[in-house]
Curated annotation (Swiss-Prot):
Name by which UniProt lists this protein: FAS1 domain-containing protein CAGL0M08734g
A GO cellular component entry from the record: vacuole
Keywords in alphabetical order: Signal, Vacuole
Taxonomic lineage from the root: Eukaryota, Fungi, Dikarya, Ascomycota, Saccharomycotina
Matching PROSITE patterns: FAS1
Length: 253
């Protein structure tokens, strides 16, 4: 089957809660298609404060995420000063994370957790540069969208595959904070991303490695165990954002 050659035309640009911004275009045969808009088409970010859930977090009853508990042999009881901000608002204002933030907003369940004052999350956020360096865009893998198009898959099946790819990518970078997670002898902690926990209901194993070297943290995927330095840490009331110049999910991995 001959692959379709697509010609973009300015028909429409759509932004919705459940899908990434899409651009509508015609192929060379005149058939309409919807696909994710290139990064340069992206509109403004959602205002996290406008969508804030009404309740607030009680930090005395429910202390914020503390990565230090993973690397201590005894219980830690300390007060952590965190800004009056939640994950959704924090990630929306970090320009170095614009692309990941855009994808996360289109995984409704993950973004709801970012807004939830009762969440305890570790968000391992790839920089814009890390995502653009991938051989394929996050919406194009692990389900191969080009192959589906060439095979004549329906628009609905392709749109569902795109959404599932986005969910896979986002949740591969979101970890539920668990204080009782044990540290291995080499000082490494094995964590479960939301994507991993969805696929492994027995609660065993993990797919994300966290390590501390002095005052610095590093993270890796269990697939290659290549550690990447955490460039910045942003603490919020319901989690922390660890910025890395890499992705934990890659095409073909």
């Amino acid at each position: 089957m001959v692959a379709l050659k697509y010609v973009l035309v300015p028909v429409a640009l759509v932004a919705a809660k459940n899908i990434v911004e899409m651009i509508t275009f015609r192929d060379e045969n005149g058939k309409l298609h919807r696909r994710l808009a290139p990064e340069e088409y992206r509109g403004g970010v959602l205002d996290g404060e406008e969508s804030r859930l009404l309740q607030k977090r009680d930090l005395e009853m429910h202390p914020p995420v503390d990565l230090g508990v993973y690397f201590s042999n005894r219980p830690i009881h300390r007060t952590i000063d965190v800004p009056d901000i939640y994950l959704d608002s924090q990630i929306s204002v970090l320009t170095e994370l614009d692309i990941f933030a855009s994808y996360s907003r289109n995984d409704e369940k993950s973004y709801d957790m970012f807004r939830d004052p009762e969440s305890d999350l570790i968000v391992i956020a790839p920089t814009n540069a890390a995502i653009t360096a991938l051989a394929k865009k996050p919406w194009q893998f692990p389900m191969d969208i080009d192959t589906m198009e060439q095979a004549g898959s329906s628009e609905r099946d392709i749109d569902n595959a795109i959404h599932n790819n986005i969910v896979n990518f986002v949740r591969s970078h979101v970890v539920a904070y668990q204080k009782d997670t044990k540290t291995s002898k080499d000082g490494t902690v094995l964590l479960q991303s939301k994507q991993y926990s969805m696929q492994h209901s027995n609660g065993k194993g993990g797919d994300v490695l966290l390590k501390r070297e002095g005052e610095k943290y590093c993270v890796a995927s269990v697939v290659d165990e290549v550690f990447h330095d955490v460039q910045n840490i942003y603490s919020t009331k319901n989690g922390v954002i660890l910025v890395i110049d890499a992705t934990l999910s890659r095409p073909g991995a």
